[in-house]
Amino acid sequence: PRRLYGEAGLIRALGELVGDDGGVLSRSPLCQSEVISLLVQLRACYHAVRRDPPQALEAILALLVPPLLTLVHGDGSLGSWQGSWAIDAADLAALVAATGVRTRPLRDVRQWGYQRVTAQKGLLLLDAAPPPLARHARTGCASTLAFEFSHAGQRIVVNCGGAACAGGLVPVRLEQGLRASAAHSTLVIDDANSTAVLINGRIGGGVSEVEIDRRTLVSEKGAGATRLEASHNGYASRYGLTHRRILILRDDGTELRGEDLLVPSGGKGKKGKVGFAIRFHLGPGIEVGLSEDGQGAGLALPDGSYWQFRSGGGQVTLEESLWVDGNGRPQPIQQLVLQGLVSRGGGNFAWLLKKMG
């Protein structure tokens, strides 16, 4: 009876921790992997004493693995979301193998809040949800509408990541900054977070609504693409503007078109113009050269490929950044920043990332 009572409590606790699509309520892939690891160890304890684990344990493992795979890049390592860092491919593969679950990544994990688009060697990940509620997360991040993009296992656009390992190789003083909107590849207004980042890992007010639309496009020539359109209200009350992001990844994976729109939301907000910055944190080892007209850049990747970034009119600058690697170590990287001023009437800012040759 004591064991049955304990098992019932475990299953109840897991039910309160995990959403209907299998994602933990912290929205953190690191937490997702930790829960999976604990359940694998628990199952091993049952086997060690020659007892059968509860059937619900296997069912929950089968529910947890597909969302985790959603946020795995082509190189097999983890994306940098909600405080997680780029956990090593070998560690992730060993964890998934230990579960015994054979499955594929989910593409549209709407309740957990992520979108995954695969296009041959190209892979796009988008955060399409508000940050987690404060009671569910230790390192909640203001990352709504941020994206990561990789091609042939090479990370091209990333988030800084690593807030959850602050205090180790990542200095504690960086934790707050790593949780900020500016530490993610998204648009930021007036250097303000889309959702308030508070001390002790908590999240305050900001984004409460996110709309997401996903569709497949086919041109007259037969070429295809996947289009994601999402918007959030995190800046509406302060600036009277809604951020809408459109991402179109061509089916061959070599061209990503983006458009960031600031749409008047009818709120009061600040008068006059405010600054905005669209940040593209670049993967490790990428060499960058700005174009002469100041509206683009060339990206030389470690694998020898060359990509071009172009803005639809705004000035592009190059700034320093950092990325937390698979060992939890901060590595120096660079970021492209498309910035300018916008009025309460809003504006739209297009950009293109394309593989050359």
Protein language model features and the residues they cover:
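Short, charged, low-hydrophobicity "junction" segments
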Residues: 12, 97-102, 200-202
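Secondary-structure boundary elements
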Residues: 12, 152-154, 252
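Short alpha-helical "patches" and their helix-cap loops
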Residues: 4-5, 51-60, 291-296
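Carbohydrate-active enzyme catalytic cores, enriched for enzymes
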Residues: 19-158, 162, 219
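CBM-like, beta-strand-rich accessory domains located in the C-terminal region of large
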Residues: 169-357
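Alpha-helical cores of eukaryotic small-GTPase signaling modules
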Residues: 1-19
